[in-house]
Amino acid sequence: MPGLLRDYFVVLPDSVAGHTVAGQLPAPGTTGAASDPTATGPAFAPTATGTSTGTGIEAGTGTSTGTGISTGTGASTRPDPGASTGASTSTGTSTGDVVTVPHPSGRPWVLARPLFRKVSHLRRGGDALVLIGPGRVPEAVLAGLLEGARDRAGLERRLARLPGLHHVIARISGETWIRGTASGLRRIYHARHPQAGTIASDRPAVLAHLTGAPLDDGALALRLLDFLPHPLSRRALWRGVHETGAGYGLALPVAAPGTAAAPGPHEYRWWEPPPPELPLAEGARRVGEAIAASVRAHVGGLDRISCELSGGLDSTTLTFAARATAPAELSLLTVAARDRYSEDETWARRAVEAARGGPTETPAPAHHIIPADQAPYFYADLTATSAELNDEPLPVAPGRARAHLLLSRARATGSRYHLTGYGGDELFLGLPHAYQDLFHGNPLTAWNHLSGLRHQLGWPLLPTLKALLDRSAFPQWLAGAVTTEPQPVTRTPLLSWGVRQSLRPWFTDHANALITAEFRAAAAEQAEPIDRWRGRHVDIDAVRMGARHFQAMEDIGMTIGLPVAAPFYDDRVLEATLAVRLEERISPWRYKPLLVEAMRGVVPDALLARTTKDHMSSDEHQGLREHAHELADLWTGSRLADHGLVDARHLLRLAAEPFSPVLVEHSISSTVAGETWLRTAEDAWPTLQPTPTATTVTTTSEALK
C-alpha cells in the first residue's frame, strides 16, 4: 500500500477494541523506509501491556532516530547537545521505527511511525503530554509544560513558548485532546471505528485503511479545482473520515463509569489570530526572532544541511538564517532557468558571494547549480507519483519530477535536513483583499494604497469602488464562488472573500453538479469564515492552502530519505506577521516590507533591495508539449473518467493540442494531480470500486463533524 507505511501516528481509545486496532496498523519491519519507502513488513502487534515485542527496544527514550530506524540503544543519530531524552523513563517503547506511548492501563494510546520527526512524551500520574515535531523536546521542558497546567487552556498558554511546529496530544483530568498547528501544516483527522469508536491520526489514509472507508466522489470532484476555499478544504477524500479545522483541536472524552462507550468527539477552538496592532519596527523584530527560532528548531545542531536558493527573497532569507546556526557544511542549490530574462540565478550568485564573505569562523557554503537543460519540465514522469500517497490531490503534483531532482541533489551532498522558502509569498506579499479591512478603520489610507495597486494592476475605477463597498456575507460569496462562466479577466478587482473559479470545460455534468452542490450546501448551512474581516480570512486561508501543498514536498523527501522543512509555516511566524499593522505590513510601493525589515542585519542590504520575482509559467506550457504523450497515456483509461468526473476524450484532444487557447485560459494541473492521486489511492485499495453514478452529496455539516 504505497504511501501508508511511511509516516503517521494514531491515537487509540483505552479499550480492548482499541488495542486490537493497534495490531491492524500498517507498519514495516525493522528496515528503515528511507532506504525502501514502499517496503512492507509484518503488522505491528503490541503485547498485552501495550509495549512492542521483538528486539531493538529504545527503552524510555520515546523518540525515533534521525533516520527513522531504531538503533536498539535508545540513542538518536541526530546530534542534540545538552538535550535530555524528553520522555518519561517509565513509559514509551519502540520496535523498529514504531514508537508506542501507552495509556495508564498499559494499552497503546499513541502509536507513531515518525521517519524524521521526533516523539517526545512525559507522564505524571494520570496526566500525559506527547509532542511530535522536528526535534526532541527535553524532559525539563515537557515537565514545565505539563506540571503547571491544570486544564487545556493552561497547557495551551505554555505551549506558545515553543515553536509552532508540533502535533500535540495531551491527557489531563481524564480528557484527551489532539491538535495540529494554526498554519495547517500539521493536521488532525478522525473516524469512527465500528468496534473501537473514535480513532484519530494525522493521516486520513491510515484511518481509511483501518475503517474500510470508500472514496468520496464529492470530495474528489472538489479537488479538481485550483483553489479549494475554507471550509470545503476540510472535506476528506474518504467517507466517514473527518478533518479537524486548523486552529481547532479534537477533544476525546472518556467513557462514563459503568458505560461501554465514550461520548463522541467534539472540536474546540484553541487559536485566534492576534490583533494587528504592532508598528513595523516591533513587528519586524518579532518576525525575525520567530524565523530564527523555527530554523533552529529544524536544523540546530546538525552538521550538514541544505537550502534551496532560488535567488528570491524568501529562500535568501532562509539561507542566511540557516547559516547563522553554524553548520559544518551548508549546501545551497539553485535550479537555473530556461528563460534568458530570468534574474533568479544572478541574485542567487550574489547571495552566495555575500554568504562566503561572512565571519571567517563560519565555513563557506557550497553552491550547486543545476543546469536548466537537466531540470525536467512540468508534467514529466507522472507515473512516479505512485511512490507517495498524499492526504489529497495537490496541484503541485505536475512539478514532482523537478522537486524530486532538487531534493535528490540535496541528499547527494550529504545533507541531513533541507530548508525551503515555501510560505513566504502567502505571508509577506499581501493580497488586495486586505484593503477591505483597512477601509473600515482608516478609509483614506486604504484608498491611497488601493489607488496605487489599482494603477499597477489596471483595475478600472468604478468596479474597484463597487468591490470596495461590497458587504456581502461569506455564505453569499461561497454560494457563487464557482461558475460555468469564463475566468474573470485580469483587470477584475479582487476584494471579496476569495477567488471566483470557473468549472473546466472537460468536467462532466456529474462533476459540475457535485462541485456546485458542495458549495451551495456549505453556503446554506451558513458556513462561518476563518475571521470576520475579509482580508484576514483570505490571508489565513492562503497560508493554510500553501501548507497543504507543501505536504507534497515533505512526502517526496520521505521517499528520497531527506527531511524537508518550510520554517515560514511555523505558527509563531504566522502570529508575528498577523500582529503587524496592516498599512505597514503590506504596501503597493514596497516588496514584502515586513520580511525586508525583519531580515535587516541578517541578510545584506544589497540582497534585500530586490523587488522582482521570477515565474516558471513558460516551463509549464512547454511541459504540455514535451510530455503530450505521457498526458495522452494518462487520459487513456482515466480513473477520473471511470468515476464520471472528466471527459477523457476532451482531455485526449487537449493533449494533442498543447497550445490550445483552452489550456491558456484553464489550468490542467489540478486535473492531472487528481488523476495521479486517484491511481495511487486505488493501488492502495485494489478492491475499491468506482461509483460514477452516485448522486448523493455529503453536506458540509456532515463532512465536518
Task: Name every feature range the model reports, one short phrase each.
Residues 520-553, 560:
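Alpha/beta-hydrolase fold catalytic core
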Residues 432, 602-665:
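PAPS-dependent sulfotransferase catalytic core
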Residues 637-705:
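Acidic, carboxylate-rich catalytic segments that either coordinate divalent cations
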Residues 1-56, 60, 66, 72, ...:
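Cysteine-centered catalytic environments shared across enzyme families
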Residues 221-229, 405-408, 540-555, 666-684:
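Short, hydrophobic/amphipathic alpha-helical patches that form generic packing surfaces
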Residues 211-212, 218, 226, 587-611:
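Charge-dense polyanion-binding interfaces
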Residues 175-177, 254-259, 270-514, 556-565, ...:
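ATP-dependent adenylate-handling active sites, centered on carboxylate activation for C-N bond formation
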Residues 153, 213-219, 528-541, 588-590, ...:
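Structural motif
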